[in-house]
UniProtKB/Swiss-Prot annotation:
It is found in: Secreted. The lineage of its organism: Eukaryota, Metazoa, Ecdysozoa, Arthropoda, Hexapoda. Expressed by the venom gland. GO terms for cellular component: extracellular space. Keywords: Secreted. It comes from the Eukaryota. The keyword Secreted applies. This is Peptide Cd-125. Is a major component of C.dorsalis venom. It comes from Cyphononyx dorsalis (Spider wasp).
Length: 8
């Protein structure tokens, strides 16, 4: 996904 890597 993407929602899990939004923490950048």
């Amino acid at each position: 996904d993407t929602a899990r890597l939004q923490w950048h």
